[in-house]
Swiss-Prot record:
It is found in: Cell membrane. This is ATP synthase subunit beta. One of its GO terms (cellular component) is plasma membrane. It comes from Cytobacillus firmus (Bacillus firmus). The keyword Signal does not apply.
Length: 467
């Protein structure tokens, strides 16, 4: 079905008029071949149908730049945007349309493709078992453990370490568990995506990974849809191959992209200027991320918190869908504690004795109680000093500071910056280290020995060197 005219171009939103009686379906992809005025070069832009305007016209969202376009002709593809799936995607980097952007061979025309808009699995297809995913990162495994097939949110403002934490999780889980990973870069820095690709190539992890990018320099249409493109690739490995798949989304800023085009689409803005369909769009994505009786998709999502305000509609809407939250705190990063995970604000529904076991649960709660008590004492210390505390409170502060530093750890992906080897700590070793620290076994070791180390044995060795 062809069309010959665009009624208007409003940045990323394009109105298209069809011949009388011809009408594309909602979410269909239109291919628009247009001429750029500056250099008279033909460029093909993909448009996604968003709204029917009546009078044989539709309003669409462009997946590419519309700058300088003035001569138009195009066709309705008769189907939604689709992306390649299966083995052909492993080791490759794609854009939102499933086109390879890694300078490798183009994706073969006969390779399997799936549409990016799909229904969530039916209720009777879902799995009800709960299994813990070991990450090798102490603060995560101890205090906010991740669930296989769950949805995990990494919350933090700009520059507190969301991307580095995601990179470490990709590295650790790929090296230790060997599962397939799909990385969706949504509105992130191109430099970070490039660094991640080369790091994954150097480590060999890229062979079991697929990457999809819609970076911050791209139009909002691409940033809105790229998370769906990555999820579609992950779903294929789950549903057709019966595999456990990890979906990394950095970050869930497609909500911000939606707010950019919402007013142009003619929708009444909602709170803080966001689209009124925010909750619906979020639900359509999140409900597809789940465990079925065949396989699972475990999603780890970096969630940008505008101005560190957790009441902003974008992070607030995401909260309802998550099984675990990892909150990154700027004050901890300023103290040199990395990862800067807030041990008191981070949560997981898996942290219960029935799921993680009695010992793990007991140690985790004791760690949180000690850190909470230390937090309550900080105001007194700031005003009156340590000398005014009771002996019992002094001991709490003494141990809490060591525990706080022991929650930090060197990352493999940060070796080039720190000059120190990264560490993967099994859950059993993590529990053992914190249990002995709570019992006062290492009270005589200096605080600095606990900073940026892995197992408790490394603390002992570092303590001997600094003694």
């Amino acid at each position: 079905m062809e069309y010959r005219s665009h009624i208007s171009v409003m940045g990323p939103v394009v109105d298209v008029k069809f011949k009388s009686g011809q009408y594309p379906e909602s979410i269909n992809a239109l291919k628009s071949t247009s001429r750029v005025r500056q250099n008279a070069v033909d460029v093909t832009v993909t448009l996604e149908v968003a709204i029917a305007l009546g009078d044989d016209s539709v309003r669409t969202v462009a997946m590419g730049s519309t700058d300088g376009l003035y001569v138009y002709r195009g066709t309705d593809t008769g189907a939604p945007i689709s992306v390649p799936v299966g083995e052909a995607t492993l080791g490759r980097v794609f854009n939102v349309l499933g086109e390879a952007i890694d300078l490798g061979e183009p994706v073969a025309a006969d390779d399997k493709r799936d549409p990016i808009h799909r229904e969530a699995p039916k209720f009777e297809e879902l799995s009800t078992t709960t299994e813990i995913l070991e990450t090798g990162i102490k603060v995560v495994d101890l205090l906010a453990p991740y669930i296989i097939g769950g949805k995990i949110g990494l919350f933090g403002g700009a520059g507190v370490g969301k991307t580095v934490l995601i990179q470490e999780l990709i590295n650790n889980i790929a090296q230790e568990h060997g599962v397939i990973s799909v990385f969706a870069g949504v509105g992130e820095r191109t430099r970070e995506g490039n660094d991640l690709y080369h790091e994954m190539t150097d480590s060999g992890v890229i062979k079991k990974s697929a990457m999809v990018f819609g970076q911050m320099n791209e139009p909002p249409g691409a940033r809105m849809a790229v998370a769906l493109s990555g999820l579609t690739m992950a779903e294929h490995f789950r549903d057709r191959d019966g595999q456990d798949v990890l979906l990394f989304v950095d970050n869930i800023s497609f909500t911000q992209a939606g707010s950019e085009v919402s007013a142009l689409l003619g929708r009444m803005p909602s709170a803080v200027g966001y689209q009124p369909t925010l909750a619906t769009e979020m639900g359509q994505l999140q409900e597809r991320i789940t465990s079925t009786k065949v396989g699972s998709v475990t999603s780890i999502q970096a969630i940008y918190v505008p101005a560190d305000d957790y009441t902003d509609p974008a992070p607030a809407t995401t909260f309802a869908h998550l099984d675990a939250t990892t909150n990154l705190e700027r004050k901890l990063s300023e103290m040199g504690i990395y990862p800067a995970v807030d041990p008191l604000a981070s949560t997981s529904r898996a942290l219960s004795p029935e799921i993680v076991g009695e010992e793990h649960y007991s140690v985790a709660r004791q760690v949180q109680q000690t850190l909470q008590k230390y937090k309550e004492l900080q105001d007194i210390i700031a005003i009156l000093g340590m000398d005014e505390l009771s002996e019992e409170d002094k001991l709490v502060v003494h141990r809490a500071r060591r525990i706080q530093f022991f929650l930090s750890q060197n990352f493999h992906v940060a070796e080039q910056f720190t000059g120190q080897k990264g560490s993967y700590v099994p859950v059993k070793e993590t529990i053992k280290g914190f249990k002995e620290s709570l019992d006062g076994k290492y009270d005589d070791l200096p605080e600095d020995a606990f900073r940026l180390v892995g197992r408790i044995e490394e603390v002992i060795e570092k303590g001997k060197q600094t003694a």
